[in-house]
Amino acid sequence: IKFVSEFLQKQQIKKQFGTYLSPAMVEKLQKNPELLQLGGESRELSIMFTDVRGFTTISEHYGKDVQGLTKIMNRYMTAMTAKIIENNGTLDKYIGDAQMAFWNAPLDDAEHAKNAVRTGLAMLKDLEKFNEEIDKEGVPAFGMGLGINTDVVVVGNMGSSQRFDYTCLGDGVNLASRL
């Protein structure tokens, strides 16, 4: 029974965190489930928001070709999300053409501020490559707005009993979104 319980717990951790953490971080959580704290906690995080600049021009380029617009946005989000995961970030959510990510939760990351900045720089570098690729396809260049803030915020599972997300909130999050 203990084996089944542990297996189910590991599967739950993979289901909950597998889509927005690197496989190595998910494995750490599976081996050490006590690192997860249900509810919320105050913690210093580095929070990043990015958004596409020039989205109106890009969407006008596609006109009524919603599949084309969806495909190019998915390519962009995939490339940028990879940088978050590679640098030990937690992808919080997509908000239209924006992304929200944070560092130092659910696992401790003593280098969270540096990792967030490294991610931003890597994203900007990859954006250049991405724009070179899509230029060959006749697609207008993507611009990127990027804000990073480090502050003590509340992080944890938040929402309703029917649906919740692992996210963060507080003044520090709001500031990052406005940078």
Residue ranges with predicted function:
Residues 11, 15, 19, 23-24, ...:
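Feature representing long, continuous alpha-helical segments
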Residues 2-3, 30-32, 76-77, 130, ...:
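Short secondary-structure boundary micro-motifs
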Residues 83-115, 129-173:
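Catalytic core of nucleotidyl cyclases, primarily class III adenylyl/guanylyl cyclases
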